[in-house]
Amino acid sequence: MLEKMGIVVAFLISLTVLTINSLTIVEKVRNLKNGTSKKKKRIRKRLRPKRQRQRIRR
């Protein structure tokens, strides 16, 4: 029984990893098609440190 459970768990883990990878690939493809989402991400990265600085000052 333990061996069967281990095999089932291994299959579930592999399936979840594959689904996550496929979702990330789909997002990357959409970003390449749009080209705007990448710019937004860069702007967000620039704004984050400024917000942190303001918190430190307060």
From Swiss-Prot:
A GO-annotated cellular component:
plasma membrane
How this chain sits in the membrane, per its record, is: Single-pass membrane protein
Keyword Mitochondrion applies: no
Q: Where is this region: Disordered?
A: 35-58
Biased-composition ranges, Basic residues, are 36-58
Q: Where are the transmembrane segments?
A: 6-26
Coiled-coil region: none
Write the record's keywords in alphabetical order, separated by commas: Cell membrane, Membrane, Transmembrane, Transmembrane helix
**UniProt-recorded name of the protein:** SPbeta prophage-derived uncharacterized protein YonT
In the UniProt record, the gene name given for this protein reads: yonT
